[in-house]
Amino acid sequence: MRSSRVLAPRANVALAGLGTLGVGGPARWFLRAEHVDDVAAARHWCDEQGIPWFVLGGGSNLVIADRGFDGLVLQIGITGTSTSRDSEDSIITAGAGEMWDALVATMVDRGLAGFECLSGIPGTVGGTPIQNVGAYGQEVSNAIEHVTVYDCVDHTLRSLRAAECGFAYRMSRFKGADEGRFVVCDVTFRLRPGPPTATYGDVAAYLKRSEVTTPTVSLVRHAVLAIRRSKGMVVDAHDPDSRSVGSFFMNPVVSEADRERVAVIAGERPPGFAMDDGRVKIPAAWLIERAGFRKGHVDGAVGISTKHPLALVNRGGAAAADVLRLARAVKQGVGDRFDVWLTPEPIFVGFGVDPDVTFLTKAQG
């Protein structure tokens, strides 16, 4: 796929303002792609120039290095949505540059189930299959029909069925074995009218307190947004606790024996969510607090949210190095106490071989 589009990348563009964490240096080159042809042209341009590229979506899941990125940052701005019907199901295709929560709101307004628990998650549609975003008992992979991608290896546009995407907990082939190979251009979802997902602990408790006996997708979205706001997990310029990447660490999945071992150490049993393989997912926030990192913890220009221990926040003027220092301390503290080693959720951009990033991303401390 060879594009004839003429590119005009900008030089030395600041990146800190393009991420919700607000850290990071400039991009050597920056370009916004509003059509799939722009993606193809940018890939060829980088190959000709011999420089790396990084594909940017909504910037809500990134830690950008203080030195920035010495290559091309390609921001995906492909927009547009379309809807068709297949019996009772609605088939929705959305451009990768569409804002995720706006799409969720539209689908909820139509009474369609499958997205309601994913309300309030920042970023763009294109980032959702990469991370296999999930919350409160739902994962986006359960609603995905196929993903249209630009293949940087053979320079073609491909459609990958959900079964070809390698979806797992907070994982996909796009950030696993094939990381860097594909650029998500649009995503097609299958949704249908029906009862919402409303059994996950926090959501179920909120609905019970609100005396909701027959949940709807709209009521569940309202509940999820309220819960996320209470934790500083909805991006809000007026809320300093939202100057973060959201949950910095994934909830670890452990054996039942390890859960009981943690209970003995902590003197109380951690809550858990049973997985299909017999293991249990326990809250990283629970482990972090019991390792001594409480809500409101301050470490210079960074800290832990006053609302939720999973969010590491930029308190103002922080550098990426400050964020890594705190993240490393949290991972080390949890690992030392419980021998459970947390895995970070965000993507680290521009760091090269960095000892802090290496420590954070390896399976054990």
Residue ranges and their predicted role:
Residues 112, 320-326:
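Beta-rich strand-turn-strand
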Residues 1-153:
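Anion-binding (especially nucleotide phosphate/pyrophosphate-binding) glycine-rich loop
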Residues 9-11, 17-20, 62, 157-321, ...:
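Phosphate/pyrophosphate- and phosphate-bearing ligand-binding catalytic cores of soluble enzymes
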